[in-house]
Amino acid sequence: MVCNLAIDAYYGCMADFSHILMTRPDFGDDDREWLHQLVADWQVIADLSFADLLLILQNGEGKYIIAEQCRPSTVMSLRAEDVVGNVVPESLCAELDAAMDSESVFRSSKLRTVGKAKVCNVYAPVRHNGKMLGLVVRETNMATRESNGRYESESISAGKQLYEMIPRGQFPYRNPVMNQRHNARVADGFIVLTV
């Protein structure tokens, strides 16, 4: 992972989500609020999917920056280090450009290596009020897909359904389901309701 020294210097060694959002003056308050709601609620997707999530935005200079990350509580994370504020390597930019142009979930054509793990990247474009804001990357360690039982298979399927709602603007929910956001924990169990 390549670290952007200019961003580190600008933010004083450690970038945070709010500061990264400030590099985008074209984002309105509504856009920022949508992204804040997304990262407040996305833990359930990481947990159900057994995958790390990254929110990638383009900064004011057009470089792809990791704006936020989410580690799953249901499986070991791929990343021990904090990658918020890091510039995405040039080798991934063409794939990110293609994902930004996609109307739905976009799957990487090749596996990547993160640490010692083989990883499949899947990208969900984040749009709000017709404006492209960025991408949520689901980084799946392929070792977690080798021998799944029914619980794991159902969990992955439910996580995939929620993840696919992001490009459609259906996740996060506009109104919180409970009085507080991010209450539920997948490890306690889950129920899938179909209508």
What are these regions (language model features)?
Residues E90-E154:
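Sensory/regulatory domains in signal-transduction proteins
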Residues M22-D31, L54-I56:
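Non-catalytic N-terminal regions of enzymes
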Residues C3-Y10:
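Short, positively charged and aromatic/hydrophobic N-terminal segments
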Residues V39-A40, L92-V119, Y163-V186:
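Short, basic/aromatic recognition patches
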Residues W42-F106, V195:
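Structured interaction and signal-relay segments at domain junctions
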Residues M14-F27, L135, E139-V186:
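Juxtadomain coupling helices with adjacent low-complexity linkers
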Residues D31-L54, P167-V195:
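Sensory modules in modular signal-transduction proteins
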Residues Y10-L21, I66-P72, L133:
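Short, compositionally biased low-complexity segments
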